[in-house]
């Protein structure tokens, strides 16, 4: 009898979790504005070019954020806060959608440990497939799989992931969903979110501060 009771309780618990999951997936999306992004970002004094880039970028990506947030169920304030905080740091406060790696991307080249993990197999793959988009899609494998998901070619011209704001956001949302980052965001686990997005903990303290700013903008704190 106890075993049956435990099984029934476990079944009920699973049904409740499924119902809660459906409830989260079907929630009205969080509305993102350019002002929110501007306030989440830090700004550069006496660097007009970067300020202009920030201003252009935050306005360019807002409609696409709201579109893809709906598709990929970033529809709670907490999920949105984590996504925006990570995007803010990855893009140097929304100033650039292209990574500036320490060695120009050669550290990702075929034959290196990182390069092998990223699926870089040809000479020049490291610089060619540096991080681009809001969450810095990196490596031949990721560009290939992203293109396959949407029946597009991002291998011939990978710079499209950074040059086109729509694609920059779409790539980030694709990677967020691929890595199941919503689960860590729901737990408010900044360490796990950072690991899933970054592959390490680069800029962790900066990401924590960006998360605080994002939570304030979204009314969480």
Language-model segments: residues:
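Proteins synthesized as precursors that undergo proteolytic processing into mature forms
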Residues: 167-169, 178-185
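N-terminal secretory targeting signals
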Residues: 1-32
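Acidic helix/loop microenvironments that form the catalytic cleft of cell-wall polysaccharide enzymes
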Residues: 87-90, 185-204
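Non-transmembrane alpha-helical segments in soluble domains
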Residues: 66, 84-87, 172-173, 194, ...
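Peptidoglycan-targeting cell-wall enzymes and recognition modules
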Residues: 26-60, 64, 83-174
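Surface-exposed patches in mature extracellular/periplasmic domains of secreted proteins
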Residues: 71-83, 96-100, 182-194
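A short alpha-helix/helix-coil micro-patch that ends at or immediately precedes a cysteine
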Residues: 64-72
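Low-complexity, Gly/Ser/Thr/Pro-rich intrinsically disordered linker/tail segments
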Residues: 12, 21, 196-221
